[in-house]
Amino acid sequence: MKLKRGKPKEKFSYDPQKVLKKLEDLAYKILEEVKAGKNPYFDVPTRGLSNVYFDEEARLIKLGDKLSRRYFLNVAHARKFMQTLILMAYVKRLVSEGKHASLREAYYANKHTIPGTHENTFEDQSESDPIIEDLERMLGVLREEMHITADRRGYVYGDIVIKDGEDEFNASKLGMGGWAVPGTVEHIQFPEINVDYVLVVETAAMADRLIEEKYPKRERALIIATQGQASRGVRRLIHRLHYEEGLPIIVFTDGDPYGWYIYSTIKQGSINLAYLSEKLATPDAKFVGMTMDDIKEYGLEHVTEKLKGIPPDKKGGPTGDYKRLIEELNYPWFQNKEWQRQLKLALKWGVRIEQQALANKSLEFVAKEYLPEKIREGKLLP
Amino acid sequence: MAEARDLFKEFKVQSVSEFFRRNAAMLGYTGSIRSLTTVIHEAVTNSLDACEEAGILPYVRVEIEELGKEHYKVIVEDNGPGIPEDYIPHVFGKMLAGTKAHRNIQSRGQQGIGISGAVMFAQITSGKATRVITSTGDDEIVEAWVKIDVQKNEGKIVKKIKHPNPKRWRGTRIELEVKNVKYVRSKQGVYWYLKLTAIANPHAHIELVEPDGKLIVFPRSSEDIPEPPVEMKPHPKGVMTDDVYTMAHRSKRSTVRRFLVSEFSRISDKKVDELVLYIAALRLINREVTDQNLKSQLIERLANGEVEKVLKSFGRKWKKVVEEVEKIMEKPPEKLTWHEAEEIVEAFKLMKFLAPPTYGLRPIGEENIEKGLSSILRPEFVTAVTRPPKVYSGGIPFQVEVGIAYGGEITNSEILRYANRVPLLFDAGSCVITSAVRSIDWRRYRVESFDNAPLVVLVNVVSVHVPYTSTGKQSIASIDEIYNEIRLALMEAARRLAAYLGGKYRRLYQIRRKKIFEKYLPEIARSLHILTGEPEEKIKEYFLRLIESKITVAQEGVSEVEVEEGEA
């Protein structure tokens, strides 16, 4: 199987005016309600598992249509109502001035004592973060589109040209460290793409290995290191590279419940950010490894490690890895025979296998044999 | 029976004054704090009663001066009718001479000892005579020093001066010098006693000057002078041998029969005939029957009304005995012996009578309780319940009233106990009022914890014969009828309190809500201004109008449409 760049399904869509309009429309709605003597409210899509479902057709974790109304004239809501408006005003300033702020900056910028009281607008960052999430869900825009950035994590290496504001550069000519993915990738554009697919790698160590082995150049691949759970920026970048640039996405993680969960999040989205799945998730992503079958296939039995936690048949179990395995067995998007097989084998054997375990063969084994072979032969999991 | 008579004679011979000396404790003169309170009580009661009878709105001023260690001068002055010169030794000197002794009347006085007891106490502790200054409002003021002749049970004026009264002052001022007493501002002290008295007598203006010169005023809050209590003829079920004996000897009726019919309630000629049969039957039983079982069986039959059958069971001699007893009824009442009085009371216990009349009871009244509690305690809520009169022990009328005061300047919980308007300061633990108040589940009435609530509960038990637990007359016995009446009254008052608290909390809640919304307005207005460009002041105005229209802080309650609260 030869991986090729396909046709784009989405267009570069970043438009600050759109966000501003949404903010102002909502603010006018509130103002009009008050003028009319009505108790003004925000309709906030409900957070949490109860309002999340798996859309089989789109193959995405999606937010349900449950709303909770946040009224001004409600003792339990009034403070949050105020906080919502404060952050809306803040976002308006950020976007119109073209500035970005981190979640923490957004918190500090808006924390002050309410005039005439001893009460602060925000007592803690744990008060402002959820309001920003609420705004994302209410307005249907990403935090990043509101110029509020998340933690940055992950980097990119490969032969593509990235346009970040004034700067334009090739991501294979920035040294071995590649290009660090910023908190916000909305405004990033890709004037030139000379790769056939994206390989998403869980650990930085493995990404570094592949870069050193010149894998990106030889295989015409773009390496994205997630460095653990993929950050929102990375997930959004993967999504955009797939849908806007037509690049196939292949994920390479450790062979353990945590690695598979990283894959699941990239592919289907997460429960916490279900409202963003359509912008963050990439259901077309495929999984290359590590799998339980790899252990037998490549003779890695002696470099496996035991799963952490208590197995389900032991007293107090299941906990740790076992618990997560059983959860994953029940995920709707893992209801296929390939994944059920991997998960059940892991449960049966009680072992995990790390990406780095492939170094047991030789340092270049992963770059020259394992990945090229599996990808060429299409030994990928859905 | 001759023995009993002799005993009583002996008792009569003993001077009541001496009796006082020996029984000072029983009369309330026990302990240094309580003794002082009792002195004040007797003097103030005298003043209030005198004003009541004369239809005067009372003004009572109490002054206490410290002369030395446990040595005080007590001054009580009133604007009452004054005492005519001739009566001074009588009023202050003779014990059991008070106008109410041996009258079946609801009274403040406790033992019929009254003010003479205070004079006596002063005399035996300090040796000093009591100084009385009084005028009936005519052209002279009498100043007299009164002592009690302990042997003769008589008051005597040891010194007397007359002064002109150009301003027509009217009233009485008495000054007593007492030792072995102590002024303390405690729950048993004078201050507390007067405060409680003021609550139960809102028509009185009461002042207290404490030893350190501090003036405390309990102002009048009602202009209604209570009607003086009416004497009620005693009910046969409510009398003891002593009552019957004493009443008979004072009676001016020609025969015992006439005495019984006219001086008791619910006794008719027919009832006297019945009484004769009962006494005869009792005589026969006591004389002829030795077997205790049989005796009590027969007495039980008497109580069931089978008096004629019981009599006939003794054969023909019963008629003779009845004739004997009938003779008692026809003799002059002053000839009635102690034993015969005893027989009459014994028979009364077994006979059936109509319940006694209750018209003589004088409760404080709901309105006046509320006034008293309001003006002295300054609560935010007050209510009172006066129950209809009831009867206990088959023949003694009584009436219960309660008042509840909540919040305001009240800081802790308190039970104010009264018997016939007189505060009961001692023996709270054994009192039926305490147990009845404690038996209420106050949480059902929105009072989380009675002990920690700003709640004052007043209970007044009104009766001709308040059943005290002991001679100290400071706590009321646990009689079921009284206990139940107190509870019923308390529950009714507590329901009103609960309704008030419900509304109060709702109002407080609404005010708090309003404040919450209002405090966020500056932030909201600023933010909406940034978002929409509408001037901040205008936005604030819109929101304020909204708050005003949606949240009404009114007595009637809430007009706000409470919205469903979603997950927040």
Swiss-Prot record, chain A:
Enzyme class: isomerase
EC number: 5.6.2.2
Positions with a binding annotation for Mg(2+): E202, D254
Catalysed reaction equations from the record: ATP-dependent breakage, passage and rejoining of double-stranded DNA
Active site: Y108 (o-(5'-phospho-dna)-tyrosine intermediate)
Cofactor(s) this protein cannot do without: Mg(2+)
Pfam family, one: TOP6A-Spo11_Toprim
Domain of life per record: Archaea
Domain Topo IIA-type catalytic positions: 14-155
Subunit structure: Homodimer. Heterotetramer of two Top6A and two Top6B chains.
Function: Relaxes both positive and negative superturns and exhibits a strong decatenase activity.
Protein name: Type 2 DNA topoisomerase 6 subunit A
From Swiss-Prot, chain B:
EC number(s) given by UniProt: 5.6.2.2
Residues given in the record as ATP binding sites: N46, D78, T99, K100, G109, Q110, Q111, G112, I113, G114, I115, S116, K473
Gene3D superfamilies: 1.10.8.50, 3.30.230.10, Histidine kinase-like ATPase, C-terminal domain
GO biological process, one term: DNA topological change
Pfam families: HATPase_c, Topo-VIb_trans
Keyword Transmembrane attributed: no
InterPro entries noted in UniProt: HATPase_C_sf (IPR036890), Ribosomal_Su5_D2-typ_SF (IPR020568), Ribsml_uS5_D2-typ_fold_subgr (IPR014721), TopoVI_B (IPR005734), TopoVI_B_transducer (IPR015320)
UniProt-recorded Gene Ontology molecular function terms: ATP binding; DNA binding; DNA topoisomerase type II (double strand cut, ATP-hydrolyzing) activity
Signal peptide: none
Catalytic activity of the protein: ATP-dependent breakage, passage and rejoining of double-stranded DNA
Assigned keywords, A-Z: ATP-binding, DNA-binding, Isomerase, Nucleotide-binding, Topoisomerase
UniProt family annotation: Belongs to the TOP6B family.
Described purpose of this protein according to its UniProt entry: Relaxes both positive and negative superturns and exhibits a strong decatenase activity.
Subunit (UniProt): Homodimer. Heterotetramer of two Top6A and two Top6B chains.
HAMAP family to which the protein is assigned, alphabetical: Top6B
Name under which the protein is recorded: Type 2 DNA topoisomerase 6 subunit B
Organism: Pyrococcus furiosus (strain ATCC 43587 / DSM 3638 / JCM 8422 / Vc1)
Organism taxonomic ancestry: Archaea, Methanobacteriati, Methanobacteriota, Thermococci, Thermococcales
Gene label: top6B
